[in-house]
Amino acid sequence: MKTNYKLCLAGALLGSQIAVSQIVEFDPVTDEMLANPPLGEWLSWRGNQSSWGYSPLDQISSNNVNQLQLVWSWAFDDTGAGQAAPLIHNGVMFIPGPRGVVQALNAATGDLIWEYRPGITPSIDDTDRSLNREELGDAAMPASAYAGVGRGVQKNIAIFNELIYMATENASIVAIDARTGLLVWETQTADPALGYYYTAGPIIANGVLVTGITGCDRYKDDVCFITGHDPLSGEELWRFATVAAPGTPGGDTWGNLALRFRAGSDSWQAGSYDREKNLVYYGTAQAKPWARAVRGTDGDALYTNSTLALNPNTGELNWYYQHLPGETHDMDEVFETVLIDVDGRESIFKMGKLAILWQLDRETGELIKATDMGYQTILNVNPTSGNITYRDGMIPRIGQQIDMCPSTSGFKSWRAMAYSPQTSALYIPITLNCELATFGPTEQVLGGGGAGPVRRINYPHPDSGGNLGELLVLDIPSAEVKWRYRQRAPINTAALTTAGNLVFVGDWNRYMYAFNAETGEKLWQTRVTTSAQGFPISYMIDDKQYIALPAGVGGASWAGMLPRDLTPELTRPRNGNSIHVFALPE
């Protein structure tokens, strides 16, 4: 497919001219296309609505991947955290960059077609309808509310009809015309001055735009939520609070805490969608402050650290499963939900920071099996009931040091696992680490709270052999280890699997790799400008398959603190957000 576009001029704005190319040939994206993506396209953040991170393309295979060559690369102008999850449609790559920038690139050549910049790009009706960044930006955030970590990271975007959707660092959802990059609408869902912001982008489910918010760590008279919106207008259709309020179902699980002191339960990773059941599945994060003793309750604290099944048209809660009731070490379970049918059972697979693989029934939320990988030292989990019990001495007390694996950075984080139907296996980026942690008190006042003071001393996992990075491969449904690959540097991207019997990942030390998905043999590697970081994808244009691997900086935990502490000999440039695209030679 040849990508057709024409050059036009958006006009003078802020004293400069903005050149814009318009996409001429563009097929509106439908619900059917999202459910069954055309071969070679990448229309959802993980390739399909089940969040597999899998490409059915096999032109690049385990037999020829060692011939991969760089076709083009593109660097972002903006500094900030880069964790891009690109989309591909009609030969165009739509990619989010730092600070709310979205660009459309010719996916075969890397040429820029258009660019959207918050507060600069005009709206489609020739007015500037963007929210005022001077009023809503970081400078307006009171120190007591500013959430800092991860702010400005836009992981994924969504595409539907003729619009691109993004959730912003200023607690807004934006719709951009996919042909021109012009702003169509912008809806603010919360007050960024209270610390609210987005890192997870939207998904589309049965014609509704759904996304969850973050920035809920500080005490305020409001809580975190997931919302559904009309994709044409941005109108909010429903809102589900991810913290149970006093007097509502589950409200007593926070004890006697007033609503303003019930913090956390952010939903900062995008969800999945089951079209037949018409349910979206979202994870939620931990309660805050992290430690029970600091937040003032030892209750379960619904709906923290849970998987939620919501009707995308109404926001009604169909079921929930709380993985870690009353969690007390910052062990998130917010991450991706992977939908797989195994042995006639329609299942969800997910893994949190503790490296426990949970298998749930998609219809009922019933636990099918919990499999502890054996890396963590904090708690015991019953594999059939899912009940957890904390090990002796592992419930934090204020001012008392505990020795725990993993650290608060976790074994698993936002770097999403991938599923391959060829091998019936999950490919999971893991970082092996432990921590000496001392939790301190915090004051229960508006604007206070947060994670709570924590003194942290990271150290290598005793069973890691000095390695920080691991690609863990589990057979499904047995959850037995199929193979694992370990190295000194952390694996720093999501995993990508393909029908060519391949799995791709990248690391903190600027390397990108391809492995034989069946055997674990390393078949190809290359090195790029800075740390590999983000969500790799694969696509096809004019019968040619491409592999796109993002690089970037910023973020927290694996991206900065752990390598600095545990692999000080490894270095990287402090900027260089970019995308690198590879293909076989002609």
Where are these regions (language model features)?
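Aromatic (tryptophan-biased) beta-strands that constitute blades/sheets of beta-rich domains
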Residues: 22-76, 111-146, 182-191, 235-242, ...
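Short, conserved, GDST-rich strand-edge loop motifs in beta-rich repeat architectures
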Residues: 211-225, 282-301, 401, 432-464, ...
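Repeat-blade elements of multi-bladed beta-propeller folds
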Residues: 42-46, 81-101, 130-172, 197-220, ...
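Blade-level signature of beta-propeller repeat domains, shared across WD40, Kelch, NHL, RCC1
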Residues: 537-586
